[in-house]
Amino acid sequence: RGSNLTHPL
Protein backbone atom coordinates (compact mmCIF):
# COMPACT_ATOMS: atom_id res chain seq x y z
CA ARG A 1 0.00 0.00 0.00
CA GLY A 2 1.93 3.02 1.25
CA SER A 3 5.07 1.60 2.86
CA ASN A 4 6.28 -1.99 3.06
CA LEU A 5 6.99 -1.90 6.80
CA THR A 6 4.30 -4.29 8.06
CA HIS A 7 4.09 -6.47 4.93
CA PRO A 8 7.10 -6.62 2.56
CA LEU A 9 5.01 -8.24 -0.17
From Swiss-Prot:
GO molecular function, a single term: aspartic-type endopeptidase activity
Top-level taxon in the UniProt lineage: Eukaryota
EC id: 3.4.23.-
Annotated S-S bridges: none
TM region positions: none
UniProt KW keywords: Aspartyl protease, Glycoprotein, Hydrolase, Protease, Secreted
GO cellular component, one term: extracellular region
Signal peptide: none
Localization of this protein: Secreted, Extracellular space
Residue positions the entry lists as glycosylated: N4
Family: Belongs to the peptidase A1 family.
Protein name: Pregnancy-associated glycoprotein 55B
Species name: Bison bonasus
